Amino acid sequence: MKLVLIRHGESEWNRLNLFTGWTDVPLTPRGESEAQEGGRVLQEAGFDFDLCYTSFLKRAIRTLNFVLQALDREWLPVHKSWKLNERHYGDLQGLNKTETAQKYGEQQVRVWRRSFDVAPPPLTVGDARCPHTQASYRGVCASGRTPVLPFTESLKDTVARVVPYFEEEIKPQMISGQRVLIVAHGNSLRALMKHIESLDETQIMEVNLPTGVPLVYEFEADFTLCGKRFLGNEADVAARAQAVADQGKSN
């Protein structure tokens, strides 16, 4: 039993080194090429799928579209969920990571980006960046007095929405024999990787997921993890992962 994860290709705000979170930005031409290459790599390795999952954000949706084009599988069913969205970066969304590191220090930015349970400063009610008034989320209702949609998130918060969705919606499909592809985001996929690999809070801080590169997990029938590998040129995969690690440095 296999599961393939792909982080979306480079987005416009990745290129500009801005905190993105739930801001709905497009792919760059480079990001489109990364997505196409990810699809070609899967096709050359003989992968096929029955079911796809992605987020509400266009950079992931379009990455999936490019992958499916490369596989000649554009007709496959696709399930979209906000629970696979990127981690919400709160009031940091739209800020330059390098400038933020210069202002607050690299260590503080690293804590915001890579710690497990520290959330950035939240958005305030009425901020135009809040998802609560955006058309994409009009079907997502509040639960009681506590809004379902976040104003900010730590990775711990992201795990709390991603993992139940995986366990309740995706894993049963895999167990039934469906071949699943998930295209999502750096932190929503890190949340899932933490769960699948049983990583602790320190280990997950060191994980940098490259853009557009298929990550293949293999499982026994009882869902015991028995294999993990990236598909693609090893040097290219390492270079993309290092580029992610270098974000948020002051120089």
Swiss-Prot record:
The active site is at H8 (tele-phosphohistidine intermediate), E86 (proton donor/acceptor). The keyword Cell membrane does not apply. Pathway: Carbohydrate degradation; glycolysis; pyruvate from D-glyceraldehyde 3-phosphate: step 3/5. Its EC number is 5.4.2.11. It comes from the Bacteria. Substrate binds at residues 7-14, 20-21, 59, 86-89, 97, 113-114, 186-187. CDD domains: HP_PGM_like (cd07067). Keywords: Gluconeogenesis, Glycolysis, Isomerase. One of its GO terms (molecular function) is phosphoglycerate mutase activity. It is an enzyme of class 5 (isomerase). Belongs to the phosphoglycerate mutase family. BPG-dependent PGAM subfamily. This is 2,3-bisphosphoglycerate-dependent phosphoglycerate mutase. The gene is gpmA.
